[in-house]
Each structure stands twice: as C-alpha cells, then as structure tokens.
C-alpha cells in the first residue's frame, strides 16, 4: 500500500518536466528512509541532472539503506550525464522500485541487471500504466522509431 503512495508521488513529480525534457522522458524519483521521504526529484531539463540525481542530492547521507521509487528504469550509460545507476550504487540505496522498464535500447533492462549485480533489490512494474501515460511520445518513439 505504501509503495503505491510513494510511486504516485514520483509520477506526480515526473509531470513537472513535461515540457522541458524532450527528447528525454519525464521521470520522477522519491527516496524513502524509515517511511519518510528524504529526497525527491524529477528530470527538469534535457541535458541536465536526471530525476535520480536530483533526489539523491536532496537526500544526501540519508539515502544510505533507503528505497528509491523511480518512474522509469535508471540509465547505466554515459550520455549528456553520467549513469544514474552508478550514483544509486554509490549512495548506498538498498532497494529500487521501478514503474516501467526503459524502452530505449541503450537501457532496456540493462539498468536493472546492473543494479541487481551490485546487490541492490529491484522490483519492476508498480503502476506502470499510470506512469507510461505521461511518456506516450517517448515510448512510441523508442518502440517504433516514429515521432
């Protein structure tokens, strides 16, 4: 029940980047420690920090041992920004709950595998339909190549 509460918050945060992140997706992240939100963020603008980094910056040391709720699978490749997976691992987060896998072939399951390989518990699919509706264009573009 609480998982849905935190993911709902992450989805609401993701909507804040609706007109500023293209061609990247809208992503929200909430970090929870002892049933309290200690960090939250969203991808604010293309080329700038992703949601996970903004949430980790807010959480600071409180991220250690926490759970992250993320609307889209974290990246584990270098693009305009460094991999979010590395930052998650370095922060000491123990659990990651992801709403949707990233359909981008550069990511698509690789972020999940990487986090699991590093000992982080990962769950996928919480409120996936709800989060994907705010990224319809991104999902369509990644799956079909069409705008």
Swiss-Prot record:
CMP/dCMP-type deaminase domain boundaries: 1-122
Residues given in the record as Zn(2+) binding sites: 50, 75, 84
Cofactor(s) in the UniProt record: Zn(2+)
Pathway: Cofactor biosynthesis; riboflavin biosynthesis; 5-amino-6-(D-ribitylamino)uracil from GTP: step 2/4
Listed Gene3D superfamilies: Cytidine Deaminase, domain 2 (3.40.140.10)
Presence of keyword Cell cycle: no
Record protein name field: Diaminohydroxyphosphoribosylamino-pyrimidine deaminase
Gene: ribD1
């Amino acid at each position: 029940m609480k998982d849905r509460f935190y993911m709902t918050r992450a989805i609401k945060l993701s909507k804040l980047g609706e007109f500023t992140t293209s061609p990247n997706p809208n992503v929200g992240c909430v970090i929870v420690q002892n049933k309290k939100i200690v960090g939250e963020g969203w991808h604010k603008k293309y080329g700038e920090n992703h949601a996970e980094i903004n949430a980790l910056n807010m959480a600071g040391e409180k991220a250690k041992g926490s759970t992250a709720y993320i609307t889209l699978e974290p990246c584990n490749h270098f693009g305009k920004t460094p991999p979010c997976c590395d930052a998650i691992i370095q922060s000491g987060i123990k659990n990651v709950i992801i709403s949707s896998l990233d359909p981008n072939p550069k990511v698509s399951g690789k972020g999940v595998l990487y986090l699991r390989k590093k000992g982080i518990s990962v769950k996928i699919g919480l409120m996936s339909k709800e989060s994907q509706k705010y990224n319809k264009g991104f999902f369509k573009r990644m799956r079909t190549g069409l705008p």
